[in-house]
Amino acid sequence: MRVLYIHAERFTWDVKDPASDIRDEPISGKANNALVIFATVERGDIPDEGFLRQIARDIIDVANKVKASSIVIYPYAHLSSELARPYVAREVLNKLYEVVKSEFHGEVYKAPFGYYKAFEIKCFGHPLSELSRSFKPEGAKVEKKVEERRDVYIVLTPSGEEYNPADFNYDKFEDLKALVDKEVFKKELSGGSEPRYLDYLRKFGFEWESMSDVGHMRYAPEATIMIELVEDYAYMVAKSLGIPVFKIRGTNMFKLSETAIESHARLFGERLYVVESDTDLILRYAACFQQFAMVKDWVISYKHLPFGVIEIADSYRHEQPGETVLLFRLRRFFMPDLHIFTRDMAEAIDISFKLHEVIFREIEKLGRTYVSLYNVTEEFYKEYKNYLIELAKREGKPILVRILPGQKYYWVLNVEFHIIDELGRPREIATFQIDIGNAKRFGIKYVDENNQVRYPVIIHTAILGSVERYLYVVFDTMAKAEKAGKIPRLPTWLSPVQVRIIPITRDNLKYAVEIADKLETEGIRVDIDDRDETLSKKIRDAEVSWIPYICVVGSKEETEGVLSVRERGGGQYKTTPEELIKKIKEETRGYPNRPLYMPRFLSQRPSRG
């Protein structure tokens, strides 16, 4: 922050036109015998207590030396070319004003932020009447309050016993130990080598986009099919909760000048993705903004509750460049974000039991399970400890609980569901939160049975996790299988190509096309390897591509009306097209379907570099 101090005999300011979407109330004012602080908030300045107290002490010290009876903090954007974002600058100046006001024995004023203003000043002209200063956040020391309390971690068992994580016996709970080591003891669990799943991603076209920002991906046709199938499946799973669900779409940019957006965004901190524009915009980091902005305009009765709203939100988080991980930690990703609006805490808790069941059901379909971290406020833990014990019972194992003193966030409960990956690292996938703050923040209301206006309790959840993280689990599961000596095989519903037909000669191509037509009519993704390659190479390429069903057809198969099938991980056999269709339909029942996003014939596809 750069500041110019002027000790003024008289200072007046008159508010004119708005200069920013982010602004205070337009209040004009005047002060006599005032130390006027022309303050420019710079990039990197933060509303940190230690930083602001450092500045406040200097201001008050100068004010006392010149015997000023008042102080005026005047937002002034002309002392630096490296300006902070308006929403940051306003917050810094507002908090600086509060600190100075609490410590100075005189009048303290602040001219409004975000306006063009006319001012008149009469400087005393003595040696200390004009001074300049520059302050940097890194030079400030945060003063710890004696009464400040730290988070507390406990291991809570299904029988209700509480343990200090350092004293718990983890012999039968290796996954919990990995989570505790990371969350409680802050041990770096790097895994020691490059994860195997990265090799698989190249096979299916999940790649970094080098011509974009760090942490942005691109998706080849095979990857695109998989991404969109998971998006479809997330909606199906949301509807399985047994409550009405509305699917919406919206924008990914929101104005920081909106009070609700700014206050919610402030909780997210430095990972905000800010867009350079004529107004301050942020890219959303989940679907919350759009869903809440829409639902606030709905007329809701208690009879409508509970209901859910879901959007597959393209979400943005400004992760550090060295922290981005392909398909896991990204700056841009797709989040199937479901918000469930409930009457009160009792109804939210009741619905959360079904939600918890579905979250575990879906991970178990992939052959995995979760180890759970329950972040709770101290008040919630005291009142609802038995609720957490019941969830631990349903998981059938101890859970890690982090108890936070005070109400720091909009939620009272934030559950993180982790897998332990191939390299032994906890990886957060699914989540749900119970939110008591955002309905009021965004003005979302309903009318109860007594005609009283109330704010709903909102559940936030990503049942599958983000689309990319769900696929991360799929590929990590394949890595574990291969590590155990098994042949990795994608779920049939997720396989970009479910059947590949390989004609032995050009004479068999017509029969291959007839079979492909029949399979495609039944909603099966099928392609034909019509390249001028040897049969062994075609089979090998199909196996490298993890095609679940490779069907070789020659004159004998054509005469008999059958297929010679090589099933991935399932041996070789002959079957009719009808039996193969029946088998695949059985494997994909209950899952979404998408067509092939590539030409049917391999000869028409360019190879990827």
UniProtKB/Swiss-Prot annotation:
Annotated region (Catalytic) at: 195-491, 196-491
Does the record's keyword annotation contain RNA-binding?
yes
Tell me which domain of life the UniProt entry assigns to the organism this sequence originates from.
Archaea
Q: Which residue ranges does the record annotate as region Editing domain? A: 1-143
Can the keyword ATP-binding be found in this entry's annotation?
yes
Q: Where does Zn(2+) bind?
A: C288, H339, H460
Q: What is its EC number?
A: 6.1.1.3
**What note does UniProt attach to the cofactor annotation?**
Binds 1 zinc ion per subunit.
Listed GO cellular component terms? cytoplasm
Q: Which SUPFAM superfamilies match?
A: Class II aaRS ABD-related, Class II aaRS and biotin synthetases
Primary localization: cytoplasm
Q: Which GO terms describe its molecular function?
A: ATP binding; threonine-tRNA ligase activity; tRNA binding; zinc ion binding
Functionally, this protein is described as follows:
Catalyzes the attachment of threonine to tRNA(Thr) in a two-step reaction: L-threonine is first activated by ATP to form Thr-AMP and then transferred to the acceptor end of tRNA(Thr). Also edits incorrectly charged L-seryl-tRNA(Thr).
Fill in the subunit field for this protein: Homodimer.
Q: Which family does it belong to?
A: Belongs to the class-II aminoacyl-tRNA synthetase family.
Please state what the annotation says regarding this protein's domains. The N-terminal domain is an archaea-specific tRNA-editing domain that hydrolyzes incorrectly charged L-seryl-tRNA(Thr). Catalysis of tRNA editing is performed by the charged tRNA itself.
Q: What is this protein called?
A: Threonine--tRNA ligase
Say which species the protein is native to: Pyrobaculum islandicum (strain DSM 4184 / JCM 9189 / GEO3)
Q: What lineage, starting at the top, does this entry show?
A: Archaea, Thermoproteota, Thermoprotei, Thermoproteales, Thermoproteaceae
